[in-house]
Amino acid sequence: MLALKDIYRKSHDGGLLTFEEACMLYDKAPLAELAEEADLLRRSVVADPDVVTWQIDRNVNTTNVCTSGCLFCNFHCKPHQTDRHFITTIEQYCAKIERMIELGGDQLLLQGGMHPKLGIEFYEELFRELKSRYPNIRLHALGAPEVAHIAKISGLTTQKTLERLVSAGLDSLPGAGAEILVPRVRKIISPAKPSVEQWVEVMHEAHLMNLPTSATMMYGHIETAHERVEHLIRIRDLQASVPAGNYGFIAFIPWIFCSTGTQLESRGVVSHFSALEYIRIIATARLVLNNIRNIQASWLTVGKKTAQTALHSGANDFGSIMIEENVVSSAGADNHFDAEGIQQAIREAGFTPRLRDQLYRYR
């Protein structure tokens, strides 16, 4: 086993840490030292180390009907709960997009549930209609579980499903539905959702197509510390398989589980936020995921001050002002920023804010 200083050097030199080395970082590294090493790595891999990027987009849910039965989600309803059903209409999309454009937004983050009746044709028609009306808006839409679900009910392979979605206007694929990429955890918190292997397969296929993607982690529920590390290693290894010149994962975004009103809470699993733990996750992620350039601080779930600290601990992006967000908010996340507020928070942390697009290019 390498000493901590040797593990740091290995990461800085571009080496892929072993599971044991990553666990040693997470378990043993003094937090201040870990954060400093992560910040040094951030400075060496981003284009401008004095800049922190941010975005204006809108998160619109296609539907709240979902068959996955995730124990951490308050937002969904079952197919038989017809009094709560909704499917967003084109008119509603247009109203939301018009407001987003007024606020300077350039991207629609489209996510929803695993609706048993919404197959590939529904999403093709939706994407084409949105692109015909708003050709300059980027569609950052769905997620690996939704792609797998659409493929299943449409009688297609996931690869063919991705190809048809891209042809219809899909610009990039969010990292939604990762949670913790460990089978033990997934079988408990989201037993009906596509498996770890399916999530990985869809993302790998997206990478082979050169479709930009992101990766996420929702932590702080039933997973162990080492299962968090296993999650990071799985993402890192998947990124290592991306063909040279292809996008792969353009960002990693971890956030804490919010338990209010969820089925997990009713079973005694309550979120306990620790700023120090979050900083340790951000710093460890930077050193383990040394092949992913961008790491986002999740101000929505951890708040302004902790997110600002994360910018000195490996994170280089402050995310979006989130004109609309329903899923995490429904479980207790209540932090908010407007465009001026998010820029001021970045300046207070000692950085220059720069508005970006989904590919992390300055706007």
Regions found by a protein language model. Give the residues of each.
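Conserved, mostly hydrophobic/aromatic
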Residues: 14, 38, 70, 110, ...
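Mobile, glycine- and charge-enriched loop segments
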Residues: 50-56, 66, 71-82, 127-132, ...
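Conserved Radical SAM active-site core
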Residues: 77-216, 220-237
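Glycine-rich, proline-tolerant flexible connector loops at the mouths of alpha/beta enzymes
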Residues: 54-60, 81, 109-121, 183, ...
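Conserved short loop/turn motifs at secondary-structure junctions
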Residues: 22-25, 56-59, 112-116, 219-222, ...
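Hydrophobic faces of well-ordered beta-strands that scaffold small-molecule active sites
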Residues: 52-58, 108, 139-143, 173-175, ...
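Auxiliary Fe-S-binding modules of radical SAM enzymes
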Residues: 1-32, 101, 232-233, 240-363
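N-terminal pre-triad scaffold of radical SAM enzymes
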Residues: 35-79, 85-111
